[in-house]
């Protein structure tokens, strides 16, 4: 299990708190400006890290030496890919859920990435080339994921009127297990220096997501126009 010291460092980290309490989430809960077009922008940008995440996990497994760590991350990957049923894969449920909410597939899964989105996915890819950075990025994602998913749920419910969103529901069901698996994936005998590297990479992950939401907030609720390529 993850040692108490590193758990506290990660859970209480100000960069994590900055992300999960990002003002963007308040905007999607209460802004009178929120409309279907704005939510479509949000969905189209979220697709890119969602789509790449299984690749990231599989590359992370390749970097791990301990079987226990491979198994822990492998369970997350198994759930992400539908537990043997492609129809239950997270990205498939994402598209079908949003289609049921009235968004077409082009809006949800074919929008060009904004620069912050592109950089986010790029760093997932680069981090997965090293064991410690990969673990930091996994943890950085999993301990903040529910707050971000809740933001999507709030936005989609407000503009669609739907209450049941299967993609949100599966995250609520599986995310506690994902966090537990990440905890199991941290070796109990990591050195202090290795722990510092894991934490530093989790911090970078949170900063990348914060930049992602900073840009979305400008595009959706500020004065910045969506680039033509991302609007296509």
Regions found by a protein language model. Give the residues of each.
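Non-heme di-metal
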Residues: 1-232
């Amino acid at each position: 299990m993850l040692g108490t010291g590193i758990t506290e460092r990660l859970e209480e980290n100000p960069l994590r708190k900055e992300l999960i309490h990002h003002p963007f989430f308040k905007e999607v809960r209460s802004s009178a400006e929120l409309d279907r077009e704005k939510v479509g922008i949000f969905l189209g940008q979220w697709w890119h890290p969602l789509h790449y995440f299984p690749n990231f996990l599989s590359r992370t497994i390749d970097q791990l030496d301990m079987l226990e760590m491979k198994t822990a991350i492998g369970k997350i990957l198994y759930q992400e890919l539908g537990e043997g049923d492609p129809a239950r894969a997270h990205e498939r449920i994402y598209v079908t859920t949003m289609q049921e909410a009235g968004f077409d597939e082009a809006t949800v899964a074919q929008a060009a990435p904004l620069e912050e989105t592109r950089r986010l996915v790029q760093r997932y890819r680069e981090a997965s080339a090293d064991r410690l950075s990969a673990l930091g990025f996994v943890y950085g994602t999993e301990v903040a994921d529910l707050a971000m998913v809740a933001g999507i749920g709030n936005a989609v419910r407000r503009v669609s009127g739907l209450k049941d969103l299967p993609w949100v529901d599966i995250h609520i069901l599986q995310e506690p297990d994902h966090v537990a698996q990440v905890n199991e994936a941290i070796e109990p005998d990591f050195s202090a220096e290795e722990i510092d590297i894991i934490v530093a990479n989790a911090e970078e992950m949170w900063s990348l997501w914060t930049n992602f939401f900073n840009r979305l907030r400008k595009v959706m609720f500020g004065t910045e126009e969506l680039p033509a390529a991302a609007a296509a």
